[in-house]
UniProtKB/Swiss-Prot annotation:
It is found in: Nucleus; Cytoplasm. This is E2F transcription factor-like E2FF. GO terms for cellular component: cytoplasm; nucleus; transcription regulator complex. Inhibitor of E2F-dependent activation of gene expression. Binds specifically the E2 recognition site without interacting with DP proteins and prevents transcription activation by E2F/DP heterodimers. Does not bind retinoblastoma-related proteins. Acts as a growth regulator but is not associated with changes in the expression of cell cycle marker genes or in nuclear ploidy levels. Has no effect on cell proliferation, but may repress cell wall biosynthesis genes during cell elongation in differentiated cells. Residues 104-143 are annotated as: Disordered. Residues 108-117 have a biased composition (Polar residues). Gene3D superfamilies: Winged helix-like DNA-binding domain superfamily/Winged helix DNA-binding domain. GO terms for molecular function: DNA binding; DNA-binding transcription factor activity; RNA polymerase II cis-regulatory region sequence-specific DNA binding. High expression in young cotyledons and leaves, hypocotyls, shoot apical meristem, roots and mature pollen grains, moderate in developing trichomes, flowers and at early stages of developing anthers, and barely detectable in mature leaves. Not detected in primary root meristem, emerging lateral roots, pistils, developing embryos and siliques. It comes from Arabidopsis thaliana (Mouse-ear cress).
Length: 354
């Protein structure tokens, strides 16, 4: 129980999604795997360590590395160990797959890959099991048996896009072309599900795009290619915070920041709209100060209003001096200075005429 909690905390610290086989697809697991190991300091990947950090069974990590190995991102180094090659190896691997696929179409292939996929041949010699693995020997043999099948099925699926003139390829057509007919319907459905998992993985990496046939509306996949997949990998599967996409609006964030800053400045300079007493005097003047013939206020009220006006003007000048922008343009700075001097002269002249 405690180990599960530690794995969950590690996944949260890396910004990975908590993986559940019943709720999440293999594409999510691959995305988490790439975010975990897509770093310059990673050279060797241990499958047991990856399974522990991602909180999944080791056989699921086998699925991940076999699909990634089919396009060159990782390479097998030893038992339960893979070396990290990175996204830069994808273009070279795709070129090799295309050349191999074209040779197979011309009939120069020395073996029948569809038979290999159907029979599930092993890609390497049987490995000796340790005492810890004896209890899981049956499942390990099944993993080794389907290892070649999944790796080869992923490569053949990519070859269909590289060597075909069709813009869209449906999953049904891919299954008919890649999977040999089997009398066992359950076995055939399992192979189709594996092909669907492979398609989801490549779609999560932006190697292909899931779409549909315009006429029949049947699900299909479009090849996106490897033109910039090396660069996209650095941005899609890194552990840092996502960058703001060009064109997104950030004005509201800056407005809120400026609003907070302005509020703090107002408190520092003691800015106030009006005193309560002055407001009450202005809104409720004495009735004796009004002449009801021409309905005009008397001179005593005018003197009081002049004092209030001077106070407001001083507050406005203090606020303007605090928020005076630091322009780099000398012409604009001189223009603002001209307006400031004109305002001071006008105010002094008005004060002398009173």
């Amino acid at each position: 129980m405690s180990s599960a909690i530690v794995v969950s905390q590690d996944a949260e610290s890396l910004g990975l999604q908590i993986y559940s086989r019943k709720e999440k697809s293999l594409g999510v697991l691959v995305s988490n795997f790439l975010r975990l190991y897509n770093r310059d300091d990673v050279d060797l990947i241990g499958l047991d360590d990856a399974a522990g950090q991602l909180g999944v069974e080791r056989r699921r990590i086998y699925d991940v590395v076999n699909i990634l190995e089919s396009i060159g991102i990782v390479a097998r180094r030893g038992k339960n160990q893979y070396s990290w090659k990175g996204f830069g190896e994808i273009p070279r691997s795709l070129d090799e797959l295309k050349e191999e696929g074209m040779r197979e179409r011309l009939g120069y292939s020395s073996s029948n890959n569809s038979d290999k996929v159907s029979n599930g041949c092993e890609r390497e010699e049987p490995l000796t099991l340790t005492p810890d693995d004896q209890e899981n020997s049956s499942s390990s043999k099944m993993d080794q048996k389907k290892e070649k099948s999944l790796w080869l099925l992923a490569q053949n699926f990519v070859k269909m896009f590289l060597c075909s003139d069709d813009d869209l390829i449906t999953l049904d057509s891919a299954a008919k072309a890649l999977l040999s007919d089997s009398p066992d319907s359950v076995h055939m459905r399992t192979k189709v599900r594996r092909l669907y998992d492979i398609a989801n993985v490549f779609a999560s990496m932006n190697l292909i795009e899931k779409t549909h046939i315009p006429v029949t509306r049947k699900p299909a996949y479009r090849w996106l290619g490897s033109k910039s997949i090396a660069e996209r990998g650095l941005s899609l599967f890194n552990s840092g915070e996502p960058k703001r996409v060009f064109g997104t609006e950030i004005t509201n964030l800056r407005a809120k920041r400026n609003k907070t800053y302005c509020s703090s400045i107002r408190k520092q300079i003691g800015y106030k709209k009006h005193d309560e007493e002055n407001t009450e005097q202005e809104s409720k003047p004495a009735a004796s100060k009004y002449v009801f013939g021409p309905f005009s206020p008397i001179g005593a009220s005018k003197t009081n209003n002049d004092k209030v006006g001077k106070g407001r003007l001083l507050e406005i000048e203090a606020l303007a001096s605090t928020y005076q922008p630091q322009y780099c343009n000398q012409e604009i700075t001189g223009l603002l200075g001209h307006f400031t001097e004109a305002w001071k002269k006008w105010y002094a002249e008005v004060d002398r005429n009173k």
